Amino acid sequence: MAASGKLGTFRLPPLPTIREIIKLFGLRAAKQLSQNFLLDLRLTDKIVRKAGSLADVYVYEVGPGPGGITRSILNADIAELLVVEKDTRFIPGLQMLSDAAPGKLRIVHGDVLTYKIEKAFPDNIRRQWEDDPPNVHIIGNLPFSVSTPLIIKWLENISLKNGPFVYGRTKMTLTFQKEVAERLVATTGSKQRSRLSIMAQYLCNVEHLFTIPGKAFVPKPEVDVGVVHLMPLVQPKIKQPFKLVEKVVQNVFQFRRKYCHRGLGMLFPEAQRLESTGRLLQLADIDPTLRPTHLSLMHFKSLCDVYRKMCDEDPQLFAYNFREELKQKKRKGQEKDGDSESWGF
């Protein structure tokens, strides 16, 4: 569990409240960007405390919006705060915070999904992967629309040790829809167990810190929000390429209500599906009647290890996509029907 940090000695001078900032700059949450503002500084302070000590830490905040969490971070005795904001409407309010904290806040107008953070912080804070985490922390109240693709992107970055993880095992404290937060931490056998559970837990220690009621946000979302802490593991629990693990996990969970052999079969071309699926399950020592939600990380490790060997034996296997095979069969069927019609059959 992340140790609770204390807010530091540096304090921002008196400033307009977040609500006043919103009114001053005529800000409205953009529905198409799934924006929701957290105005209660007691809650933003709690997020920062739960992140652990941020003293002398370089913080990367994603989606700062009007600057609620930004203020709490600036009061946490940090080394520097880098914020990346896509919506230009928020830049003037963030600039006001930057002026109030000289040398502490750096603002980038950009998209967090494409922003390159590898050179944003000093090289001397980098740590070896096996060492303690670096003095870098990612914090963010993520827009619902980007939270899942963003965490998947960062999980792949962890596996490759690039992006924000070029500095080492960078910690993350992030908000998600409560349902997504529950999936991230879901244990074997729970109904929330999903693709996201496996992808996060094979690479990180994941903890659901606390839940923020939806009514705390403006505008009020239809769901509550979970605050989640992720710490990259020194050694992943599945030592295979990220794309391979992702393919196996995706195929299994696309038929989450079926027995696991149903989804695993989609890893193989139809002509060899029955035989290859049986071989995969036998070599991995997996009961074919287990449901996807009842497969443990060790089960997935075995499946990925065996599938990797099968891909090594057949170099074309990994590129196989059962949906493409279905499309080709459909096209051939349509062509056959067309030929029949042209001959008057």
From Swiss-Prot:
S-adenosyl-L-methionine binds at Q35, N36, F37, L38, G63, E85, D111, N141. SMART domains: rADc. One of its GO terms (biological process) is rRNA methylation. Its EC number is 2.1.1.-. One of its GO terms (molecular function) is mitochondrial transcription factor activity. Pfam families: RrnaAD (PF00398). It comes from the Eukaryota. InterPro entries: KsgA/Erm, rRNA_Ade_diMease-like_C, rRNA_Ade_Mease_Trfase_CS, rRNA_Ade_methylase_Trfase_N, rRNA_adenine_dimethylase, SAM-dependent_MTases_sf. Residues 1-27 form a transit peptide. It is found in: Mitochondrion. Keywords: DNA-binding, Methyltransferase, Mitochondrion, RNA-binding, rRNA processing, S-adenosyl-L-methionine, Transcription, Transcription regulation, Transferase, Transit peptide. PROSITE patterns: RRNA_A_DIMETH (PS01131), SAM_RNA_A_N6_MT (PS51689). GO terms for cellular component: mitochondrial matrix; mitochondrial nucleoid. PANTHER family: DIMETHYLADENOSINE TRANSFERASE, DIMETHYLADENOSINE TRANSFERASE 1, MITOCHONDRIAL. Interacts with mitochondrial RNA polymerase POLRMT. Interacts with TFAM. Belongs to the class I-like SAM-binding methyltransferase superfamily. rRNA adenine N(6)-methyltransferase family. KsgA subfamily. S-adenosyl-L-methionine-dependent methyltransferase which specifically dimethylates mitochondrial 12S rRNA at the conserved stem loop. Also required for basal transcription of mitochondrial DNA, probably via its interaction with POLRMT and TFAM. Stimulates transcription independently of the methyltransferase activity. This is Dimethyladenosine transferase 1, mitochondrial. The lineage of its organism: Eukaryota, Metazoa, Chordata, Craniata, Vertebrata. The gene is Tfb1m.
